[in-house]
Amino acid sequence: MLKFYLENVFHLIFFAKLPEAYAVSDPIVNVMPIIPLFFFLLAFVWQASVSFR
C-alpha cells in the first residue's frame, strides 16, 4: 500500500512539473502540425523542378 502511495505521489509531482519544464518548446509544438504540409508542398515543388515528368 505504501509503495502504491509513493508511486502516485512521484507521478503527480513529476507530471505536475512537466508542462512548466517544457514551456520553452511551446512555440515549436505549435508549429509541428504544419510540418507535414511542407513535405506535401515539397512534392509539388520537386515535380515542378523536373517539369512534371
Swiss-Prot record:
It is a single-pass membrane protein. InterPro entries: PSII_PsbK, PSII_PsbK_sf. Residues 1-16 form a propeptide. Its main location: plastid. It comes from the Eukaryota. Keywords: Chloroplast, Membrane, Photosynthesis, Photosystem II, Plastid, Reaction center, Thylakoid, Transmembrane, Transmembrane helix. It is found in: Plastid, Chloroplast thylakoid membrane. The keyword Thylakoid applies. GO terms for cellular component: chloroplast thylakoid membrane; photosystem II reaction center. The keyword Chloroplast applies. The chain crosses the membrane at residues 28-48. GO terms for biological process: photosynthesis. One of the components of the core complex of photosystem II (PSII). PSII is a light-driven water:plastoquinone oxidoreductase that uses light energy to abstract electrons from H(2)O, generating O(2) and a proton gradient subsequently used for ATP formation. It consists of a core antenna complex that captures photons, and an electron transfer chain that converts photonic excitation into a charge separation. PSII is composed of 1 copy each of membrane proteins PsbA, PsbB, PsbC, PsbD, PsbE, PsbF, PsbH, PsbI, PsbJ, PsbK, PsbL, PsbM, PsbT, PsbX, PsbY, PsbZ, Psb30/Ycf12, at least 3 peripheral proteins of the oxygen-evolving complex and a large number of cofactors. It forms dimeric complexes. Belongs to the PsbK family. NCBIfam families: PRK02553.1. This is Photosystem II reaction center protein K. It comes from Huperzia lucidula (Shining clubmoss). The gene is psbK.
